[in-house]
Amino acid sequence: SVVCAAGNEGDGDYDDFEYSYPAAYVDVISVGAVNKKAVPAYFSNANLVIDCVAPGVDIISTFPNNTYASLSGTSMAAPHVTGTLALLKNWSDDVFQRELTADELYAQLIKFTKTLEYPRTIQGNGLVYLKPR
């Protein structure tokens, strides 16, 4: 599975679509951004190919010169989904005793989304959410 940031050209209008590539290509998991309260980020692209959203506002990340910075963008959200897919792949290998196909892994990812009270064009299937065991 290829995971891509949905893009930061959003204008806050969920009916005004912004497409960014490679996120808008078929078979790419397109990830939008939400803040810590699960509210879609104003800059996050809205369109018909968003697959899911993840935290992407005020994310502490590495920065040049061995420092850290608070960054915002769908590029901060996409790694959350990549990490979630890695955990699901590890888990599914144990549960199913075989390696899942990309489509099966995607279906497992979507099972771990929580639908938010916003249009599908800004959240796709919802917020990626894994409960700790």
Mark where each language-model region is.
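Substrate-binding/specificity loop regions of serine endopeptidase catalytic domains
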Residues: 1-51, 58-82
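Residue-level recognition of conserved structural "scaffold" positions that shape functional pockets
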Residues: 14, 80, 90, 131-133
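Hydrolase catalytic cores
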Residues: 56-123
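Caspase-like cysteine protease fold
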Residues: 119-133
